[in-house]
Amino acid sequence: MLPRGAMLGRLPLVAQRLGARGVAAEGVPGLQCSAKTNVGKLAGALSARLREGAKTTLDSVGPAATYTAIKSIMVAEDYCSQEAQGKVLAVRPEMVKLDPRTAPSGRETQTVAFRLHVALADPLPELDQELTYMSADTNPGLAARLLVRVVEDKGVVPLACMGDKSCGIALRAIMITEEFLGRNNKLGTKALAFHAKKDTFQQGSEERVRILFQCGLVPGSLYK
């Protein structure tokens, strides 16, 4: 068993289980995020939908766009903090196939995107736990095996990410963890989600910033 504080980097491959988990229901409105999307404007649109009680999703393609989406979610939480009454934004990641695009040559291309389901939820407990560090080289399947054990034992698990690629790996690991929990009959009517926040830490003489994902089970009804 790997220690919880260990860096999960450059690990041997396990079965590559990750794939599209289904296409979102037709007619459900969603927000789009690219690498060049203005974080503040997207956060404003997201917080407006949350105030209205609407089911909210963000679609992003590629690590840079997904990183921008996560930053927008953190800013949106600040925007709606007064109305939230102590609640936080809990995010459930999913992978979906977007509508095919037709190139000028007539060839259709299929794109897979992250779809981040965002909802107001009660804060997840923060226990005295070591961080699990996610890197760009982390194997998400192997990481998920560790996360399953921690979630089953403690109920929550904190992940630390630095950069867009490590955040994308963390999202994949969270999705696979949810699948494993379902197979172990530990999910029930709940979903595995995360709350994202910035964390400043000291590394030698340098101050650095990372993103922490506090992962845990929330009511699945939040996203239905």
Where are these regions (language model features)?
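Conserved mixed alpha/beta catalytic, RNA-binding, or beta-rich assembly cores of soluble enzyme
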Residues: 29-55, 60-78, 113, 121-179
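C-terminal edge-of-domain segments
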Residues: 82-129, 184-224
